[in-house]
């Protein structure tokens, strides 16, 4: 009665929790939604006896106006991960291929398998997308390519020139998706600007989320911008009433709260830089790869390799829950100044304990943030 291929379907592993520990495993904001957005959510609860607008017309209209595109170019979904799944379903038949970097967003291979598509993972090169190798992996059955920028879990970005060179090698009948779940944290001036690239390439779409910077992970809301034909197809394979009323109201309010958002994001970026300064100041213990890569997201990647699980356990003993990728590394979310203080103290003990840095190494980055005073 059950599809036999589901027995080999890898399970998506969410960030774990532990009572009394600091959870830095899921790239969530540790703060509540933006104040003005919280007020709108509270007001919207009075109408929960009614179905939401199935077309999400007001939200899509607000997004279209904000982004400077037509309404027909915008889709919304139950988180950007749902939109990624709809993209696979809308573009791929059984046996068609989807190309993505690996390691990247771990849902990609799962979404492919669910849709009957074949995932083609192309290894990262020094923690970054190898766009040349990805273009070479495109074959006759390739229908879709995901470029996660900034990349999850390494935090690295592709440059505008690299991306345009890559797009020049992609066949016109292959859809490329810029997955920009962490775009609000990206300070890399050389990164492609999505709206500019959408005007250049008719086979390009951009996927974003309200889960991270906007602090709406619990409401599940994402949006897609792309060609009208693709948006129509994505909507056809979506679940009816897939975006709930609270999410729609919160999305509209979030677009209108860009000033509040900027303050919050700037604070997170400052904490990311503080963590990176600490990691740059310690002495790696004979590793072939750097301890971390420059991140443009709300997390940092610790290149622990075979010691990833040991580092994960060492951090747990210090009261910090991170996200372990066994045999590869550990991803740690960056949040507030107070939580960064806890993280840095934990890293100071955990990194030497597993032999990733020289014992007793000092770092100028290990100091309390002035924001925490």
Swiss-Prot record:
A GO MF term: histidinol-phosphate transaminase activity
Residues recorded with modification N6-(pyridoxal phosphate)lysine: 212
The gene coding this protein: pat
Biological process (GO), any one: L-histidine biosynthetic process
Subunit relationships: Homodimer.
Cofactor(s) the protein requires to work: pyridoxal 5'-phosphate
Organism encoding this protein: Corynebacterium jeikeium (strain K411)
Family, per entry: Belongs to the class-II pyridoxal-phosphate-dependent aminotransferase family.
Catalytic activity field: an aromatic L-alpha-amino acid + 2-oxoglutarate = an aromatic oxo-acid + L-glutamate
HAMAP family registered for this protein in UniProt: HisC_aminotrans_2, Phe_aminotrans_2
Primary role: Aminotransferase that catalyzes the conversion of aromatic amino acids and 2-oxoglutarate into corresponding aromatic oxo acids and L-glutamate.
E.C. number(s) listed in UniProt: 2.6.1.57
Keywords for this protein: Aminotransferase, Pyridoxal phosphate, Transferase
Name of this chain's protein: Aromatic amino acid aminotransferase
Gene3D superfamilies per record: Aspartate Aminotransferase, domain 1 (3.90.1150.10), Type I PLP-dependent aspartate aminotransferase-like (Major domain) (3.40.640.10)
InterPro entries found in the cross-reference section: Aminotrans_II_pyridoxalP_BS (IPR001917), Aminotransferase_I/II_large (IPR004839), ArAT (IPR024892), HisP_aminotrans (IPR005861), HistidinolP_aminotransfase (IPR050106), PyrdxlP-dep_Trfase (IPR015424), PyrdxlP-dep_Trfase_major (IPR015421), PyrdxlP-dep_Trfase_small (IPR015422)
């Amino acid at each position: 009665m059950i599809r036999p291929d589901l027995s080999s379907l890898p399970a998506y592993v969410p960030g774990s929790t532990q009572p009394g520990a600091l959870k830095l495993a899921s790239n969530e904001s540790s703060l509540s939604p933006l104040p003005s957005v919280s007020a709108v959510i509270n007001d919207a609860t009075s109408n929960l006896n009614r179905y939401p607008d199935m077309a999400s017309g007001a939200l899509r209209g607000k997004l279209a106006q904000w982004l400077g595109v037509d309404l027909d170019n915008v889709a919304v979904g139950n988180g950007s991960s749902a939109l990624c799944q709809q993209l696979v379903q809308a573009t791929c038949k059984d046996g068609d291929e989807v190309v993505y970097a690996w390691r990247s967003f771990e849902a990609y291979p799962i979404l492919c398998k669910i849709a009957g598509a074949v995932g083609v993972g192309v290894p990262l090169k020094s923690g970054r997308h190898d766009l040349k190798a990805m273009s070479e992996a495109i074959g006759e059955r390739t229908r879709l390519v995901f470029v996660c920028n900034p990349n999850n879990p390494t935090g690295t970005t592709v440059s505008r020139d690299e991306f345009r060179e890559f797009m020049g090698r992609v066949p016109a009948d292959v859809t490329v998706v810029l997955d920009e779940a962490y775009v609000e944290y990206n300070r890399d001036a050389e990164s492609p600007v999505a709206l500019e690239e959408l005007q250049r390439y008719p086979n390009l779409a951009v996927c974003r989320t309200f889960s991270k910077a906007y602090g709406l992970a619990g409401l599940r809301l994402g949006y897609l911008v792309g060609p009208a034909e693709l948006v129509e197809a994505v909507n056809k394979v979506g679940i009816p009433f897939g975006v709930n009323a609270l999410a729609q109201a919160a999305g509209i309010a979030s677009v209108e709260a860009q000033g509040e958002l900027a303050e919050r994001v700037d604070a997170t970026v400052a904490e990311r830089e503080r963590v990176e300064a600490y990691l740059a100041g310690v002495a790696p213990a004979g590793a072939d790869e750097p301890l971390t890569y420059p991140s443009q997201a709300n997390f940092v990647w610790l290149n622990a390799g075979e010691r990833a699980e040991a580092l994960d356990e060492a951090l747990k003993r210090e009261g910090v829950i991170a996200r372990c990728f066994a045999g590869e590394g550990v991803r740690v979310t960056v949040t507030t100044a107070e939580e960064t203080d806890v993280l840095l103290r934990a890293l100071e003990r955990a990194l030497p304990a597993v032999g990733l840095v020289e014992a007793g190494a000092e770092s100028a980055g290990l100091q309390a943030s002035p924001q925490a005073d």
